[in-house]
Amino acid sequence: MKKYFAVLTGLFSFIIYLATLAPSVIQIDSGELSAVQATLGIAHPTGYPLFTLTGYLFSLIPLGLNKAFQLNLLAAVWCSLGTAVFTYTAKVMLDNIKKFSSPTIRQEQKKVHTKRKGKVKISDRDKISASNEPAEKTDKSKETRNYLTAVSAGLILAFSRTYWFQSTSVEVYSLQVFLFCLLIFSLVKAYIYEGDASDLKFKNPWLWFAFFLALGFSNHMTTLLILPGAAYLYFLKYRFSKKSFKSILPMLGVFFPILILLYLYLPIRASQSPVINWGNPVDLERFMRHITGKQYQVWLFSSGAAAKKQLGYFFTSLFSEFNVTLFIVIAGIAAIFFESRRIFIFLAICFLTTVLYSINYDINDIDSYFLLAYISISFFALFGVMKLSSFLKMGKNIYMISVLIIELFIIVQIYVNFSKVNQSYTYDFEDYTKALLKSTTKNAVIFSYQWDYFISPSYYFQNVENFRKDAVIIDKELLRRSWYYNQIRNSHPDAIKGIEPEIKLFLQALQPFERGENYNSAVLENLYRRIMTNLIT
């Protein structure tokens, strides 16, 4: 059983995830992303090619489920795999904790151990008893404790609110948490790796880190948040030298080809005019605009007030994330600070980088941007569990009490967060979208800006389930983007056939705006209103 501890932890979380899985699309981007995966389209910036390709392949498996539910199931799979990798990484970290300790801390620990040893008086009878006791008993006890500690930390992460919520429906962050866990695993293995970073060997974990990093960036740009922590561990191990910088080159040789290969999906697929073709990234200008998320940069580092608001939200929501296990986290922060300063600094860097970056993004659904911070917190919880389980030395009864407290805290966390994340009865967005479409006449033109509740779900129901494909749904805000007209032209050419002259004038006036050049806002607004008016007359 011990051999499969990480797999079993992931499997247990998957079973619980099934109970909270959404049966259909839910709010925000769920409908659009489900449609993109099912139809092999182009998603909103930054495109998410890895997410799209893996989702499309999974959607082809004949499971006998509706596509929305099947793709939601994939989200649960990603989160479960993330839990399994996290749990295994936690065990590796505990087994190699001395390798992460600085020489100063190791010397201090050795002095304390020697001092305590000198104070203990051992009788002849005790010596005989000790000599007969198997030497492996203590090691086996520690090994078992490490397994249980790693599993406990894995469950704390798996059932934290935001992490758990990613398992309920289609979103890019379910795959991202899996990739974050793989990145941290490869970093831990790389730090304890005895070979050179430039080794061109299959087992070199630094090359695996580069591979997972490329996968991460091809899924979501928040992958960059792992880089400061990675740099800390790398240069801590190899120091700043000419050789250490040259050793990065083989990693780049792995990173860039994989990244480029995956992102080539966007222009290749866009040139085939998929039904969902956000940004139409067929040329270099549109491609760069899309993968950099230029249209969303207006909300990034927008103001100090916004950052202060998001920071306040992060800390006030922490208890809602972890509930009573937050006390284990606090104990873990103190424990690892003294036990292994290097692990503490690595986790602190990941935590602070994530929080300080994410609070500067002024959006409502900010929680998922804190996921790497929540993973870091769960590693702190690992050492909190380790500290509590160390009470074994104080007697079996005290140890059992500490274990029961840990288990009780995790059960409370699962119980409280279950109702917060449960989407198993969520049909609201399907019912609302279908009811609205049913209420319209054939070939109706519907103007809307309700992305979260109607437009995004309609992408799925119209393009995957073929429900009321005759209706022309226009996102009035996306009419301000040049690529959107190409998408309408492909799906409903008759809808804009009579206003092509106005569209041509608008696109000419829009070009300098999209390029960040000087533009005439009055002309743009006038043409935009003319297009909307002519669409419904």
Language-model features, listed with the residues they occupy:
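Aromatic- and kink-enriched transmembrane "portal" helix at the membrane-lumen/periplasm boundary
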Residues: 18-20, 64-68, 72, 79, ...
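Transmembrane signal-anchor helices characteristic of membrane glycosylation enzymes that use polyprenol
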Residues: 2-27, 157-160, 220, 253-273, ...
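Short hydrophobic/aromatic helix or loop-helix immediately within or flanking a transmembrane segment
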Residues: 37-69, 76-77
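Membrane-interface alpha helices of multi-pass inner-membrane proteins
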Residues: 36-39, 153-158, 205-219
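ER/secretory pathway lumenal C-terminal domains and tails of membrane proteins involved
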Residues: 97, 169-177, 182-194, 205-208, ...
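Transmembrane alpha-helices of multi-pass, membrane-embedded glycan-processing enzymes
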Residues: 55-62, 71-86, 91-94, 98, ...
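Extracytoplasmic catalytic/substrate-binding loops of multi-pass membrane glycan-assembly enzymes
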Residues: 21-33, 43-55, 275-280, 424-429, ...
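Transmembrane-helix motifs of polytopic, lipid-linked glycan transferases
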Residues: 7, 73-137, 182-189, 379-383
